[in-house]
Amino acid sequence: QQQISEMGSNMIMIHPGADMRGGVRQDPSAMQTLKLADYEALRDETNFLSAISPNVSSSGQLIAGNNNYPASVNGVGTEYLDIRQLTVENGEMFTEADIQSSAKVCVIGKTIVDNLFPDGSDPVGKIIRFSKIPLRVVGVLKSKGYNSMGQDQDAVVLAPYTTVMKRLLAVTYLQGVFASALTEDMTDYATEEITEILRRNHKLKASDDDDFTIRTQQELSTMLNSTTDLMTTLLACIAGISLVVGGI
């Protein structure tokens, strides 16, 4: 439950592809149904969102001088910080102008700083390389540490989504869209509105299934609670069987 709350208040996640097709769950990274035009339509037309950001990522090695570290560069918009409850502690977030120009800039987390700049030097203004592309560090995120599942939330690199799409991946589609509803009570209204806009954009007929998947923070919490309840029941059953087998 704590991990879900750490992801950001009222968060809504939109992924390409149907949740299930022919009884088989699809790999979202292989789907290309979400385009920049979808993000722009949602940004301009929705009434129940406080923030929205595209998401596209590329994995590889980060290099600074003689130091390197495996990481993913996440291409996002400026509102991603609000959605994920992140704060720039040193320097600044990249700008809309950087997004428009596909600027080779990035914002990094503390784990990246510690591994690429172990001498303690200020990374802001320095160049790191990813897939032979130089990225100038413009900001460092405030540390969030590890989440309740033991995942390092500081091993993060953010760059303009246009930079990742054009310079790193050479793709025209998105791997996802993150958004925040204005309030928790408005989440359902927001998802309905998102569904209507995307179905219209994708020219889907009434009989067509959605070619995208929407998940809300509330849904994730419910799923996690259900899984926890199931595991609790399962463990209780196993314990009971053990007692019977042991003759207790």
Locate predicted features.
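Hydrophobic, regular-secondary-structure patches
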Residues: 1-72, 76-82, 114-115, 165-166, ...
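Residue-level detector of beta-strand face positions
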Residues: 61, 125-129, 213
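Membrane-embedded alpha-helices of multi-pass transport/permease systems
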Residues: 238, 247-248
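Hydrophobic alpha-helical segments typical of transmembrane helices
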Residues: 38-41, 48, 112, 160-163, ...
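Peri-transmembrane interface segments
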Residues: 1, 194, 205-241
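Mid-to-C-terminal secondary-structure elements
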Residues: 74, 79-94, 98, 103-207
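Residues embedded in well-ordered beta-strands within globular domains across many folds
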Residues: 13, 50-53, 139, 178, ...
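Short, flexible, glycine-rich and Lys/Arg-enriched loop motifs at helix boundaries
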Residues: 19-29, 199-211
